[in-house]
Amino acid sequence: MQAKTAMMAAVALLAVGGLAPLAAKQTAVDYSAALASSERPGDDTVRDADRQPAAILAFAGVKPGSRIVELAPGGGYYTRILSLAVGPNGRIYTRTSRLGQAVATWAATHGNTSPGVVTAASASLAPEPVDIVWTTLNYHDFKIIKVEGGDFAIVANRLAFAALKPGGVYLVNDHDGAKGTGTSQTDTLHRIEMAGVIAEVEAAGFKLDAQSDVLRHPGDDHTTRVTETGIRGKTDQFVLRFRKPAKRR
């Protein structure tokens, strides 16, 4: 199991190497120990081949000691990986509309993980500036949640920008929609067109730094609900790395 995980991690680093020039300048981080940890449930590890977590962590620049806000952690698949990857000197702040049991259970035995609630009225995402704000397969859901003045995606982008250190990373991964569909399928197929996400996040002050094709699936025609048998785990997904502009000297 450990040998297989190490091989997946090495392949993942090669997979993103040509897509993320800034990441290539950084010292490569070995995520194999985190991914092979016996603390991860079996239901998580069987999903690794589809979700390519080592590649996504490398693309985002996750490393020991990183401070990360994870928006909408769901069942905690990435919460557990991120917590193990950043180690005892790092910090994971999970933020969602309601606290989930899976994340709460993990946090109870892992002091580097701090669950919390975020709403449209929240003033901040974390008690300190963070290196990365992370959301996977949730941005389309943010568009469904309506708040005063628009939808929760606008709130999430604003809070993410405020939470990040200058030069920090906003990692957005979601199921892509067909060209021209925009946000029309967020509540039906649970897809969102990448072009609109880029425009919206950049309007919040971010700059698109790079995108990874590691979760691209050309065989997905973008017409099927993402939870349908046969497509689940094999959807065509975009992975975008935005940066908060660094302060000018």
Regions found by a protein language model. Name each.
Residues 64-74:
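Conserved class I S-adenosyl-L-methionine
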Residues 31-59, 63:
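Class I SAM-dependent methyltransferase Rossmann-like catalytic core
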Residues 101-127:
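S-adenosyl-L-methionine
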Residues 124-137:
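A short acidic, Gly/Pro-enriched loop at the edge of an enzyme's catalytic core
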Residues 221-249:
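Core SAM-dependent methyltransferase catalytic element
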